[in-house]
């Protein structure tokens, strides 16, 4: 059985989260599409929040 890929917006959120954990700035968002960019920034904000709470170093 083939595995389904995650939808593009879910992937954008995940990529933004990883970017936030990696210390990238929000200006480094690679997406131009407004929906994908919004999801990426949401993931980025979640990661920054988690880092500030001490969940990641």
From Swiss-Prot:
InterPro entries: Ribosome_modulation_factor, RMF_sf. Keywords: Cytoplasm, Translation regulation. During stationary phase, converts 70S ribosomes to an inactive dimeric form (100S ribosomes). It is found in: Cytoplasm. Its main location: cytoplasm. It holds the Pfam family RMF. Belongs to the ribosome modulation factor family. Gene3D superfamilies: ribosome modulation factor like domain. GO terms for cellular component: cytoplasm. This is Ribosome modulation factor 2. The gene is rmf2. GO terms for biological process: regulation of translation. HAMAP family: RMF. Residues 1-24 are annotated as: Disordered. It comes from Colwellia psychrerythraea (strain 34H / ATCC BAA-681).
């Amino acid at each position: 059985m083939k595995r389904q890929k995650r939808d593009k917006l879910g992937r954008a959120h995940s990529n933004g989260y990883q970017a936030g954990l990696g210390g990238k700035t929000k200006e480094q968002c690679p997406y131009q599409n407004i929906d994908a960019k919004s999801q990426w920034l949401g993931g980025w904000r979640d990661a920054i929040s988690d880092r500030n709470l001490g969940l990641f170093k």
